[in-house]
Amino acid sequence: MPIPGESLSCNKSNSCLYQVRYGDSSYSNGDLAVETFAFDSSTSNESVVFPKVVFGCGHNNDGTFNETGSGIVGLGGGAVSIVRQLETTIGGKFSYCLTTLDSKSSSKISFGPNAIVTGPNVSSTPIVQKSPDTFYYLTLEGVSVGNEALAYYIPNSNSKASVEEGNIIIDSGTTLTYIPSSLYEGLESTLEKSISGNRVSDPQGLFGLCYELPNNGEFNAPSIIAHFTGANVELTQENTFVEVEKGVVCLTFVPSEDLAIFGNLHQMNFLIGYDLENQKVGFLPTDCSKTQ
């Protein structure tokens, strides 16, 4: 999601330039444009057409932009995102299902009433209204590893029972999950006691907990449950450890004293639905490589 502070300037010939910067330091500069967008329909063979959609035609891009993709779709709550521009048509509803890193299938995204995530295995958590409205704020009450529960307390709070509402954002554009150091340290310590393996230093200098991958490729780590208000999201080893270089796997939680973020590695193999009309996010464990 873009961070607050993007700029727009127009000249007398009605040509407008934009600048947008993302939380991972990637950026895009270029011309603002208007075009008709068409999407495949899930209910018919005809495309769904949206006229006069505002988008950026980037001429100077750097960071998480590459030639394998056509661009970035803005799914945030800000006024210029595709979600807000199509809000009346899609009813404030969209969902996506992110495949794993080694999957040969494409991830899926849906807009409109058919994007609602339903079923007995769906767990939902409220979206908390905070500023800036670009972000979708959730409340993370804590995490657990087995029987070990670790609470997310307000730093410097007089009450250890306090959990600040909207203390984390969910972002499909951020790779890792960032949590406060106080919570991270407890998580790392608990995992280290649970994992049998040769701990090694992070070759990239970014991760805190890394292990040597055995020659047989078998590395076993316990599942981690992220406890959101009303929703317990169980993260498997596929979500929580990633091979950062040949033979080294690292924990995908990292400490940060800035904004806490629930990143996309922890969203893999979940059908995640956003209902902005009812202000909630739903999680459904799903094999995203097999979704239609």
Give the label of every model feature segment.
Residues G23, S41-S42, V54-N60, T88, ...:
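Aspartic protease catalytic domain
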Residues F37, S107-I109, Q279-V281:
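Hydrophobic residues embedded in beta-strands of well-ordered beta-sheets
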Residues M1-V53, H59-N61:
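Signature of the N-terminal lobe/flap region of pepsin-like aspartyl proteases
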Residues G71-I82, I179, I261-N264:
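Short beta-strand-centered segments at strand-helix junctions
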Residues G77-V80, R84-N114:
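Extended, H/D-rich, highly charged conserved domains that either
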Residues G30-V34, G69, E164-E165, N220:
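Short, solvent-exposed loop/turn segments enriched in Ser/Thr/Gly
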